[in-house]
């Protein structure tokens, strides 16, 4: 699988938060090697490839698990229950919570607006979006528009690396698209 756990750090306090830890061991090894404490675990949604490391990381570091209130019964170890449009602020971490249903009904995006970083989980990928498992196509469309409304300089971090496979799907549907052809060449390098 090409799941991507992402981390943010506070260099002064030697603390970090991780978004969607699919597994614990690589994160534990990295943080211990760097002498960094994992303070927060942020979950965009309940799928196992995004929460698989929650319990082991919480046990290892005493981390605080953060997730969407309406999905709390499906997120193991959850401690902080977030609402749509809430500003979550803890230590030096600050993010606006954006409810983005479609892939799942309880999916959220963490928008670290001061740093201009958004963690979209499985809502948005490079050249694609997540599958609709629980939500509707209308919800996904609205969710993608919420992400689209973020400032242009916002860096988007998605939950998986599917760019090459998504590009193959796109080029089948638009074989004469020169911009897409250039993008595929860049991806393959």
Each PLM stretch: what is its role?
Residues 1-12:
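Single conserved hydrophobic/aromatic residue that forms the stacking wall/gate
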Residues 3, 16-19, 132:
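Pocket-edge positions in alpha/beta enzyme catalytic cores
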Residues 16, 23-99, 116, 183-186:
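Active-site HxH/HxHxD metal-binding segment of metal-dependent hydrolases
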Residues 18, 87, 109-111:
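Conserved hydrophobic/aromatic beta-strand scaffold that supports enzyme active sites
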Residues 104-189:
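Metallo-beta-lactamase
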């Amino acid at each position: 699988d090409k799941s991507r756990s992402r981390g943010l750090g506070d260099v002064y306090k030697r603390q970090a938060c991780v978004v969607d830890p699919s597994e614990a061991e690589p994160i534990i090894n990295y943080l211990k090697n760097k002498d960094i404490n994992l303070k927060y675990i942020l979950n965009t949604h309940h799928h196992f490839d995004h929460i698989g490391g929650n319990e082991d990381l919480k046990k290892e570091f005493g981390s605080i698990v953060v997730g969407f209130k309406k999905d709390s019964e499906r997120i193991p170890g959850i401690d902080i229950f977030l609402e749509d449009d809430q500003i979550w602020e803890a230590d030096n971490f600050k993010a606006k919570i954006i409810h983005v249903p479609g892939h799942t009904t309880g999916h959220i995006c963490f928008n670290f607006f001061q740093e201009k970083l958004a963690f979209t989980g499985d809502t948005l990928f490079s050249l694609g979006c997540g599958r609709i498992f629980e939500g509707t196509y209308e919800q996904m469309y609205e969710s993608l528009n919420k992400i689209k409304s973020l400032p242009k300089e916002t860096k988007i971090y998605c939950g998986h690396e599917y760019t090459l496979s998504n590009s193959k799907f796109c080029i089948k549907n638009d074989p004469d698209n020169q911009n897409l052809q250039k993008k595929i060449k860049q991806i393959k390098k």
